[in-house]
């Protein structure tokens, strides 16, 4: 037994829209069935398919008495089962927008008399028919042929009803059992297997009640022993929906009375209702079967989703069952009144949704657009029925008389609920008298039942109230019912007296019945079981009188929320989501907030999980973080990752929760599961910050995240050797990526090992060597050594030994002192370092790896010296110009050589400057001393001559020692410079590519290598560059000469005259050489680079070279004087050099001005003549000789119009034009041609295309010029 909650979710709807729908449906006669957004109306042999949106009606005349039908929306096929004589016929129609086609008509059964019910599968693949003990399956093939199979029951009981549920499950209902079969369709044949069965017997009910009694006693014993627990149960939250405090059973005595009352209730009902049929209905939305057994007054609920079976005890008899959406609709009859109850019975959800008092029973319920249309039975007062325009009743009679028996027509008028025949008005009076008599008896019984109900449920309800004992709802009965029952109670005695009279009158009426009526009564039971279960036999107009409408979804949510039925609200929303737009996530959020306030954090987090795609994650995270509920927060964050609704912050937060809970294993398992989803780089950073280095190492190595593995080895553990070995086991891409990231560190700590491994990779994978050049940018010496190992052809041990022996012999003969020995040891160290490199090189060439794993810092320093010696000591022969990246390799090699060359030149200049300063200081000191001695001690000159000589000898010795050191250093630097220049020149000369020439020019200009610049610029025919650098080179040479002259300024005054003469000679030679260079360049390059020449000639002191150059250019280039003035202005030169030219130019200008004045006077005279002609045109008359119109070519007649352009027109020819038409059209043509010409001139490509394609190009250009257009 269940306790039902009352939530009124329905209201009567009387709006205009619903009235329009009701009038539209009532205008068609027949039975109405809603299929999605369409109505199907059946009337005998006709089917009307009505589309309310477009008001399209398709009428199908089946020529059969329609028994059953089904419309499939996917293939748009309609299967109709109909009766023709004694056979069952299936016809298949294809429905389109406004037409239909009959695909096939098939005969299923020849004997139709015993068939109770037919079922059509929604997939339109098979049909099921029910006889008394036999179920027949008809499988429809694609060609609409039939394969037949049967299910025969051997028991004594007849089959009451059958239903076809989801997943091809067949439900067979008998009087005492319900059987569930699984249908299997294989090879166009239907087989079945029994899944389960449920007992509907009275003994089974009693056993279940006794079990409940024991369970209730145990609960009461526990509650009596533990009063605290009882109090706690009363104070529990209202989310436990299945138990309601106001209906709980309180005492053991009351429980015993309840169970005894139920037994008596069942015994009394079985005596009264032995012959009552079983009512049943199947709800497709819930996949639930409802069975009402009026013999026991029990409603069985079979949930086919989980095969759960439960029952509900009823108080009153159920007349009929209906199901729409997920609602169960029960129709009851009490005291001549009909009560309609709408329930939701699904799992633990037990709701009474609406109660309604009716004066007439309901034949069907239609659901459309969230409206429940109640079809109310009305007895036909007149035998004639008005038929709509789609159907002609008289023609139907003729067809049915030929096909059906006379008794079959009576079946059409039979009521499918009460099975009473409405024949005439006299029968109505007779049955009314009988019903009134029965009502009195029923009322008395109801009073006794009410008293028993009061004892069972301890409800303090008045004797005059109607008690719905079956569902324990006293509040749901309308006031109309109460009034009716109250009036019946007061008129009880009057009814008892009237019943006796009515009984006597009834006997008289029955005697006066005619023989024809008796014959009709005997024929009433002919074929009464045929198709009774299909409920398909009512044909009346204007049946829909009441329309119920569900309340607004917001109101429904508030109702559930007030009563705190959140779980039922969620179930209701899930059931109703296919019919209405409901925000289920919002409902879960409300329920979760409620649970969170009740401190039920675990249940709340599971409800918040349901709102993942709706609710912001920050809302939930903030709530749980404030209370430090990391355990529940981890559940929510894990679900975010399951539903793919997360970001990097969520993963970091989840990992931090694992860390705070010390769940290291769970953290590792989470990373392993979600490795493809999460950002591993950020997770590794988090783990590294947390100190889990070993975890990151293991994970990165396992999942082949090479970058993180190597980065940890290098940055945290500084294990370069292990990381190098790991890197060179990888593929080429990963090797390159990791070397570009950490290569500079490997070269710093393990240079020889890295170079060796790089060589192996380059040979193995055929990689170009230039890819790895960026690794050596911090150490140029090792870069050069790396390149030489691959490209130098001239590395030979014999040559190197020969060079070493020469150097040793040279230095041993030269030096004998200690200083000399120190320098020799330095050179020996350099030679030994060079030997180390060559040994390594020879070992690599022979295939023997060098043992470079245990090298120290000293060896690294030796390696660097070997690289330096390689640059300065060997004449290279490099194969640079063969690969794809030749430009890069050339740039690197030549840049290294040029850097070394620049450093050596800077060092040489510094040494020269220092030596010059020292010599100057010494000589000045000595001269000063000698002058002082000469002035003071002239008499002692002879005595001190010897001392002076000795001092001179000492100074000469010192000079000799210093000069020897200088000579040694100069020899070394000169050798180095010669080798470097040799290698640079060789690279430049071997070059034959223009692009490399351009790169070499840039590099040579950066490092001021003028010799190479002049060579490359002449090869490239870039004479401007050769001019600039040749002059620059000559200037540097002259500067060196001037410095030498300045060195001799400290000498006595006798030599100053010679120094001044040398300055003058240098100046003259300098000016002549620069002028000659400029003239030669002008001959080679022409007059394009005269700006450079002007610049250099303006720097000279003598202007005669500039005047010569200007005269030459003026002859060759025809430069104007204004251009010459601007050029001289740039370089701040005076105009005296072009004075004669300016005077000649001014004289020419005066002559031209005089000529122009004469031309101006002539033009003025011509203008005066033109003005006189215009005045004559204004004031003088014109002779018009035109006799014909210029348009129509007819003789002119008044009115006529003449123009000065000598065109004449009729006034009607011109109409409203005030302009000469012929001239105006010509002007238009000219304007269009000008516009085209402008457009074509703006499009230079088109202009030149037409110009090239034209035969006479001069005429083409002259046409454009004739339009008065010139390109801007």
Swiss-Prot record:
Transmembrane segments: 771-791
Bias (Polar residues): 957-967
Top-level taxon of the source organism: Eukaryota
Segments of skewed composition (Low complexity): 234-260, 850-861, 909-956
MF GO annotations: protein-macromolecule adaptor activity; zinc ion binding
Pfam families in the record: VPS11_C
CHCR repeats: from-to residues: 608-752
Zinc finger (RING-type): 1189-1224
Region annotation Disordered: where it falls in the sequence: 216-260, 842-862, 908-970
GO CC annotation terms, alphabetical: endosome; HOPS complex; membrane
Membrane-related topology note: Single-pass membrane protein
PANTHER family: VACUOLAR PROTEIN SORTING-ASSOCIATED PROTEIN, VACUOLAR PROTEIN SORTING-ASSOCIATED PROTEIN 11 HOMOLOG
Name of the protein: RING finger protein PFE0100w
Taxonomic placement: Eukaryota, Sar, Alveolata, Apicomplexa, Aconoidasida
